[in-house]
Each structure stands twice: as structure tokens, then as C-alpha cells.
Amino acid sequence: LMGVIYSTLAIAPVQFDREKVFRVKLQDEKQASILKNLTQTIELDFWYPDAIHDIAVNMTVDFRVTEKESQTIQSTLEQHKMDYEILINDLQEEIDKQFDVKEEIAGRHSYAKYNDWNKIVSWTEKMVEKHPEMVSRIKIGSTVEDNPLYVLKIGRKDGERKAIFMDCGIHAREWVSPAFCQWFVYQAAKSYGKNKIMTKLLDRMNFYVLPVFNVDGYIWSWTKDRMWRKNRSKNPNSTCIGTDLNRNFDVSWDSSPNTDNPCLSVYRGPAPESEKETKAVTNFIRSHLNSIKAYITFHSYSQMLLFPYGYTIKLPPNHQDLLKVARIATDVLSSRYETRYIYGPIASTIYKTSGSSLDWAYDLGIKHTFAFELRDKGKSGFLLPESRIKPTCKETMLSVKFIAKYILKHTS
């Protein structure tokens, strides 16, 4: 009997043998509509932009397709003389290649590797044990599947001070994002009293860090489907699972009719803040609004530093200020390994998005909100090899420290 029960529970992980990732450069309207038409009959998983309705002329589009459909795609692209390349020839091979750093000690958490959720949970406990005067863990809520949502507060325990809220892993498959949040907490706590800048920052401000926003989705991307993006909530009247948490915030939530299909990876959910994860974060930020002066969210991939707005091409009142911070922050980032980032408002730099955490935080009154799209530019996409984690974290750390110094000096 146990065998029967077990086999129904254990859905085998999705295999991606010989699936391909294409990159297509769209020259004109005709080519854009050819690509859009393909999606009527073939299921494409968009890597960049996030969804079919974001496609526009002169855009470079990355998407994943099954081995079976890749022939059709290729012949259509060639027939219409479209400019394309195959970024990834065998997705499963690329997935296996991510883990290119040897474990020092089997089963132990490592900053040089991707860590699954269980390792991250025990890591949060260890950080508090190791730095009790500097790190505390706050449970801000739980997920649909009843996993805890933990924020780590870093900073001196006494008194009210300015704060920065940071989150990672709102999209499950963007693994390098939670890796950065872990690195940040580790570096901040460990360098207090040793590194001059970090010590000054932590003496005068707090950091609230949510290492994994979309815990259920993250677990699912480890155990069942590496390409999963959304959370894992059930949708009424649909067999399709999950909401895109970064379309679920109460800011211009219903302005994009294209995000109301539960089967899409950018599904906005049945209502603004319908998701437990979103609600936990918004409640926490609202209750600390007096102190939170900046909000930073980490995604991958494409090497960009973005700021509001996403839902409109209108520029926010402090646009010049945000532009200046982003310009210097990307300069600082490139000083380490010459990694080039582009920067600008979401809507004009990439495409319009509605219901995002960034715009929500800004309209709530947090006047410095930024989204990092971490490495790379598409060679590995979401499957950045582990050997790139540390360089990515080190360069991003410089950038975040600059933003924090700026916030300390220039906000009231």
C-alpha cells in the first residue's frame, strides 16, 4: 500500500532534454506579429520579455521551446529571414551544468553554491546564533503551502533608525537572486567592526532582508520544475497553478488585461494582494513605513538596474535623483569585473509592467526603489553556473553599499 501512496505523491521532476532557448531580434512589426502568431499554436516559455504581450519592434526576445516544436520555430524564422540564434541547444544539459562548484562538505550550506530551501532555513538560524547582537529573524507570515516567510533584520538592536528593505527570489527560477541575499547578510554581519563603510552603515541604519520571497515556488523549482516562476496557489475555475507575485501588488493592478489568464506565467492573481506572500510583505512594509527609506528587489537576468515607473512612461518627481543613483551604482558595480549594466525607468528601459512591487513601494511613499536584474545577459539566462555566483554577489554588494550610503546621507 505504501508504494501506491508514494507513487501518487512523487511526480517525477520535469526533464528538459534537447529543449532549446532561441534569441530573436525583431526588425519590424511584421516580424513581431509572426512571433506572436506562433504562440497561438505553440507553447513558448518567454525568458525575455516576461510575456508575449510585451513584445515590441526592435526587441530581442528570448524564449524556450520543446525539442518537438523547435523544428517548426526554426523553419518559420528562416522562412521569414528573421535574425535569430540558439542560446541554449540542450536545456537539460545546461541545467546539469549549473552545479559546477564542488561541495566542500556534503549537505552543508555554501555561499559559492545554490542552496535549497531547507539549507536556507537552517542558515537563517545560524546567522542569528553567530551574530545575536546584529541579526534577528522575524517571521512575517507564511505561504500558501504553510512555509514560513522569514525576514532577517541586520543592524544594532537599540533605537529607531533608517532602514532599507530588500527581497530576493520573488520569481522561483531566478536562483542567483536568493544567493545574493544570503551573501549580503553574511558579508554585512561578518564585516561589522572590520569594514569601515559597513560598520558605519550598520551603526546608523537597519537592513530588512527577505532571502526568499516566493518560498513555495522556489521549492518547486528545486524538486519538480526548474523553470517554474509563479507561486503555488490554486486558482478557482482553473487547473493552472500559481500567481506571478510581481504582478499581484496593488498598483495599476488591472491595467494590463493580458495578465488575467491563470495559465500564463505572468498571471496577476484574482485580486490585488490576493496572495499570502504579497500580503505578508506589504503588511510588513506598511508597518515599518516610517523607517524604510529604500526598497530594493533582486531578479535575474539581463544586467539592469531599474527604477519606477513600470506601469506608465510618466517619470516620477525625483527622476533625476533616481537616475543619478542608478548611474553611479552601475559604475561602481562595473568597477570590480567590468560587468556592464544598463539603467533607467522600467517602462522605457524594458517594457510596461503592472502590479509590481517596485511601483507599489514607490507609490506608498518610499522614494528610492530599485530592481536589480542580475547576471547574465542570456548565455545561461536563469541557469547561471555556480562558479558565477561569487563574482555576481561581490560586484552587486558594492552597488548596494553605495545605494545605502546615499540613502543615509540624502534622505530625511
Swiss-Prot record:
Q: Signal sequence span per UniProt?
A: 1-10
Where is Zn(2+) bound in this sequence? Answer: H171, E174, H299
Keyword tags = Carboxypeptidase, Cytoplasmic vesicle, Disulfide bond, Hydrolase, Metal-binding, Metalloprotease, Protease, Signal, Zinc, Zymogen
At the top level of its lineage, which domain of life is listed? Answer: Eukaryota
Proregion positions:
11-104
Gene Ontology cellular component list: extracellular region; extracellular space; transport vesicle
Q: Where in the cell is it found?
A: Cytoplasmic vesicle, Secretory vesicle
* Cofactor or coenzyme needed: Zn(2+)
Q: Identify the catalytic residues.
A: E373
Give the main location. Answer: cytoplasm
As for family, the record states:
Belongs to the peptidase M14 family.
The molecule here is called Mast cell carboxypeptidase A
Q: Which organism does this record belong to? A: Rattus norvegicus
